Amino acid sequence: MKTIEVVAAIITQDGKVLCVQRGEHAKEYISLKWEFPGGKVEFGENREDALVREIQEELAAEIHELQYLMTVEHSYPDFHLTMHAYSCTLKTGEITLQEHVDMKWLTPEKLNQLDWAEADLPLLESLMDLS
């Protein structure tokens, strides 16, 4: 099974966490699911640089104060995901969705109200435990 290495940003602002919703996808298990923004680590790229690049591409925003949180391993039906999560803050205040269909800022205790991608659930639980 193919393994994909990705990074995810837990962006916080005023006690709330940024959540983004994927668009419709042929793979039902990720279609319209909520997730933390991020994406694939490219060959030769370190994780922090990958996350900064992905947030620029997906949200047209800059992040800083990256702090490693945890790594999640999750097997979907046709690939294995290794996801490295970092907490961070926005350097710029504006977000423009480039790839997602919706976004919400939620307090940690309200995160479980959304329909999350399975790989993000351990992050969700960790954030809710910290609140």
Residue ranges and their predicted role:
Residues 1-18, 40:
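Conserved N-terminal beta-strand and adjoining loop/helix that marks the start
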Residues 62, 72-94:
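Active-site-adjacent beta-strand/loop module that shapes the phosphate/pyrophosphate-binding cleft
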Residues 87, 96-127:
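NUDIX/MutT-family hydrolases
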Residues 58-65:
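Short secondary-structure junctions
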Residues 16-57:
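Conserved Nudix-box catalytic region and its N-terminal flanking loop in Nudix hydrolases
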Residues 51-55, 86, 103:
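Hydrophobic packing within well-folded, soluble alpha/beta domains
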